[in-house]
Regions:
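Short, well-formed alpha-helical segments that are part of the catalytic scaffolds
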Residues: 14-29
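Hydrophobic helical membrane-anchoring modules
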Residues: 1-3, 149, 174-293
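Donor nucleotide-sugar binding loop of glycosyltransferases
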Residues: 16-19, 42, 95
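Short beta-strand-to-loop acidic/aromatic patch adjacent to the donor-nucleotide binding site
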Residues: 82-93
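A conserved acidic beta->alpha catalytic loop
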Residues: 39-47
């Protein structure tokens, strides 16, 4: 507990049996009030290890995806009375030793959510991040900052902390169940005016650490750009993306929500229009930035 605010850590897990114990051992003592692990139909003994460690354990019988797993994590944390929720990946890629610092930034009302950036300290490549991922990370972050008009050093970290107010307010049910969930959630928080903070975070890539392959990375990158473009189109009054709709029914605390499928021709036309309008605008901004540099 910090400043009389209850701290919960959520662990969205998939095949994390080999690294879970090491992750928990690095938790700072005396700070975390609740630890919740949601297992997304792992093929190993993640659930058994979690139960041995005494963690509150939730098991998906079918894989719901990375975003779907987080929805379960945050819902459980809210139901169990958390005031601040820190998401830590149980693959030991991010150090849990920053939990106190991240939670403090929210507990003392400096920020509403905090991102742990691997870029601020320049440790990404030193920690083993593949070069193509580093380059794409920087390119995507630059494009996102231009489109969203922010100065965030990294949108793609999996290490985050959120206030209860943010989690109760965002329409998270409307977000993707896949990896782009992370970006949609950040964009939602910016859209609704919440304060974002960052903290420098080392990272490490190793055999047991989870990482998406090249094909899924490309899919993720396209999803990230689409998310930022739709944000810009909404600000320009040219689109009303569902994940940015301020609908109480799409919140985790709201009634069950299932997004209606969008017809393919309509989605395609919206995407083409978005690329045309925002592409021209982004090109101008990039040229201006190049001439300034």
């Amino acid at each position: 507990m910090l400043n009389n605010r209850r701290i919960a850590v959520v662990l969205p897990a998939y095949n994390a049996a080999k690294t879970l114990r090491r992750t928990i051992e690095d938790f700072p003592p005396g700070i975390v009030d609740d630890i919740i692990l949601t297992d997304d139909a792992s093929r190993d003994n993640t659930v058994e290890v979690s139960q041995e460690l005494g963690l509150a354990t939730i098991r998906h019988l079918e894989n719901r995806g990375y975003g779907g797993n987080q929805k379960t994590c945050y819902t459980a944390a809210l139901e169990r009375g958390a005031d601040i929720v820190v998401m830590v990946h149980p693959d030991y890629q991010y150090t849990p030793k920053l939990i106190t610092a991240m939670a403090s930034m929210i507990a003392y009302d400096e920020f509403d959510f905090v991102l742990a950036s691997r870029i601020l300290c320049g440790s990404a490549l030193k920690g083993g991040m593949p070069l193509y991922k580093y380059v794409s990370n920087r390119a995507l972050t630059f494009a996102q900052n231009v489109l969203i008009e922010q100065k965030i050093s990294e949108y793609h970290t999996g290490y985050r902390a959120w206030s209860r107010e943010v989690l109760e307010r965002l329409p998270l049910r409307a977000c993707s169940d896949d990896f782009v969930f992370d970006n949609e959630m950040v964009v939602q928080a910016i859209q609704f005016g919440f304060r974002v903070g960052e903290i420098s975070c080392p990272t490490k890539y190793f055999q047991e650490a989870s990482s998406i392959n090249f094909t899924r990375s490309v899919t993720y990158g396209l999803g990230v750009l689409e998310t930022a473009i739709m944000f810009r189109l909404k600000r320009l009054g040219l689109a009303e993306p569902g994940f940015l709709d301020d609908d109480p029914g799409k919140r985790l605390a709201g009634p069950d929500f299932k997004a209606p499928p969008q017809k393919a021709p309509v989605a395609a036309m919206a995407a083409l229009a978005g690329v045309a309008v925002v592409g021209a605008w982004l090109g101008i901004r990039l040229l201006r930035a190049a001439f300034r540099g």
